[in-house]
C-alpha cells in the first residue's frame, strides 16, 4: 500500500529526502497485493501496486547537512492507514513526526503535513503476475509544524505497476521468484518554482521472494525465518523539473529484507545516497506493517461497500 513518501520531510534536509522515501500459499491468501501466485509485499519507499486495509509504522534515521554544510541528525516516525472503500478502491491518511538535531544544539521537532490519498486497482493479469493501479496523493500545506512542514500543498497523481517473473519457463525456475514494481508521478506544488519547485517522483524495486521459491519452484526445506523472507532493493528517486534545481535528480538505493506472515510484515533497509546532492551518509529504515484485512476481516479489514 502507499508508502509515506519522505520527499516532503524537513526543508533543512530536503535534498537528501527528496526521493525518500516458508508459509503455505493459504497463509498469504488475503494479503493485499496478490495477483496469480504472486504476492507483492508493502515496500518502504516505493509504493506497491495493491490496495488493502492495513496500517503501517516506520522509523527512519539519517545524517544529512543543511545549506551551510552543518551535520544534522534526522529521525522520523511515520504512520499510514489505508482503508478499502470497495475491493478495488482505497483511501489513505499519513504523516510523520520529525526530529532534527544539529551539533550546535539547534533542533526542530514536530509533525509534518498530513497527506491524503486515493488509489484504484485498475488492471490485473494473473497468468503473467501483473497488476497496475492509479492514484492521487495530496500533501495538505500548513497542517504540520511551521518549523518542519511546507506551507504549500503538493498534488501527486501517479501510476503503480508490478510484474512477477513467474511466467518464465521451468528451465529458468530459480529466476521465477524475482519481481519488479515501479511508480511514476509528478509532484505539483502550489508554491512558486523558487519556494517549492515541481518535480517528477519515480522509483523501482527488485524483489526475490523465498516464499515463492519454496511454494512455486522447489521446496528446499529452508528454515524459519529465512523461509518467510523477501529480499528487496528499492530505488526512490526525484527529478526537479523547475527552478534553480531543474534537471537535478536525488534519491537513494535501499537494500534490505522483509519478513512476512499472514497478519503483517517487518522490514529493515539501508538508505545509500545516489550522488552528492542526495547526501553523504547512509541511513536506515525500520518498518512494521499490519494487514487489517486478515487481522479484522469482519470489521476494520472489511471494505465499506
Question: For each predicted feature, which ranges?
Answer:
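Bacterial N-terminal signal peptides that target proteins for export
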Residues: 2-15
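Compositionally biased, intrinsically disordered low-complexity segments enriched
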Residues: 8-10, 27, 34
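N-terminal signal peptide c-region/cleavage motif recognized by signal peptidases
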Residues: 21-28
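Transmembrane beta-barrel domains of Gram-negative outer membranes and organellar outer membranes
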Residues: 29-305
